[in-house]
A protein has these predicted regions:
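Auxiliary Fe-S-binding modules of radical SAM enzymes
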Residues: 1-89, 148-149, 251-260, 265-351
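Short polar/acidic secondary-structure junctions
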Residues: 71, 84, 94-96, 188
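Short linear Ser/Thr-Pro motifs
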Residues: 72, 105-106, 119, 199, ...
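Generic beta-strand structural signal
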Residues: 77, 89, 100-104, 112, ...
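Residue-level structural signal for beta-strand termini and adjacent loop
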Residues: 93-94, 175
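Canonical Radical SAM [4Fe-4S] cluster-binding loop centered on the CxxxCxxC motif
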Residues: 95-144
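Conserved AdoMet/S-adenosylmethionine-binding subsite of the radical SAM
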Residues: 145-151, 157-325
């Protein structure tokens, strides 16, 4: 039995039409699910009894099971969820000045093998289904509505999505696209495409395919190194798609979409954080419609990497080369909020 959360509005319309129901019923169902937060088909009273019976017999509306909910002093909330096959995934709520941002997971584990990342310690087991990605947002939305029941400032709903959790989103390409479709649909969450950011470590063919769609969603490149020598050491994907190929894909994306791109750069002590590295990075991305998001490293005991003590100098070196850059705020340092960290600790892989 399929979860109804996996379907876009168009897909649900087609299913209903094939079964002799009206296409407009899909809009009614979406309104119940996403506007009224009702998942019980029997309570969808403007649907015919026959349709409610059909839905109950052919679809489920199961959400994720919360295993852990950790709330940080800075307001960050990290959830560990159990899936139907007893695997676990993480989702993070990050309150921002501009709204409520949620970081979602797209895979159980990750095969990209980035040596500094807690996610990569657990290899990819499977892709998440669309409903499993959607359910993360749905669950956090419910959490916010319960936390701020009478709020009128927007704090009680998810407004921004970053697809930067466990896994490589473009390695789960079709499901990620359907997820974005549902997020963006005014009949569902109604989250504007420019409030959605998809991150990739550099799957060049998928970056180009994503560019061809000309979506208004944001693209972030997990770069983390200014040259092939360093990137080969910490990101195995670079051996398949070295920086010259990655930068060609970036240029293609910018040309096709006319959208600014983000380069994410985790600063790791004595690995990629020297002033010389900053100058190399500036030369690599000079002239591109882009900015750099400098990220303090969140340490994992099981690997030798440590947080850089040279962040300020690196930032100033980029600025001196006229590179747009920011240092990202650290979220949830007191609650194991690094990507994959909570899950790995619970499963006994990290200490």
């Amino acid at each position: 039995m399929n979860n109804i959360l996996k379907y876009t509005n168009k897909q649900l319309q087609d299913i209903l039409a094939e079964n002799k129901f009206k296409k407009f019923n899909a809009d009614q169902i979406f309104e119940w699910i996403y506007t009224k937060n009702e998942l019980d088909f029997s309570k969808m009273t403007n649907l015919s009894l026959d349709l409610r019976k059909y839905l109950s017999e052919n679809f489920n509306t199961d959400l994720l099971e919360e295993l852990v909910c950790q709330e940080s002093n800075d307001g960050t909330v990290k959830f560990l969820f159990k899936l139907c096959d007893n695997r676990s995934i993480e989702t993070v709520l990050m309150p921002q000045s501009y709204g409520q941002s949620v970081c979602v997971t797209t895979q159980v584990g990750c095969n990209m093998g980035c040596t500094f990342c807690a996610s990569g310690i657990i290899k990819k087991i499977r892709n998440l289904e669309v409903d499993e990605i959607i359910a993360q947002v749905y669950y956090v939305n419910r959490f916010l509505k319960n936390k701020y029941p009478n709020d009128t400032t927007g704090r009680n709903r998810v407004s921004h999505i970053v697809v930067m959790g466990i896994g490589e989103p473009l390695d789960n390409y079709e499901n990620t696209l359907d997820f974005i479709n549902i997020l963006n649909s005014p009949k569902a969450f109604g989250i504007g495409a420019r409030h959605i950011t998809v991150s990739t470590c550099g799957l060049v063919p998928k970056i180009k395919a994503f560019a061809d769609l000309q979506l208004q969603a944001n693209l972030a490149i997990s770069l983390h190194a200014p040259n092939d020598e360093i990137r080969n050491q910490i990101m195995p994907i670079n051996k398949a798609f070295p920086l010259v190929k990655l930068m060609e894909a970036v240029d293609y994306y910018i040309e096709k979409t006319n959208r600014r791109i983000t380069f994410e750069y985790i600063l790791i002590d004595k690995v990629n954080d020297s002033v010389e590295n900053a100058h190399q990075l500036a030369a690599l991305i000079k002239g591109k419609n882009a900015y750099v998001n400098l990220i303090p490293y969140n340490e994992v005991h099981e690997n030798p990497f440590r947080k850089s003590t040279n962040i300020d100098n690196f930032f100033k070196a980029l600025k001196s080369k006229k590179i747009n850059c920011i240092v990202r705020k650290e979220f949830g340092a007191d609650i194991d909020a690094a990507c994959g960290q909570l899950r790995a600790i619970r499963e006994g892989i990290l200490k």
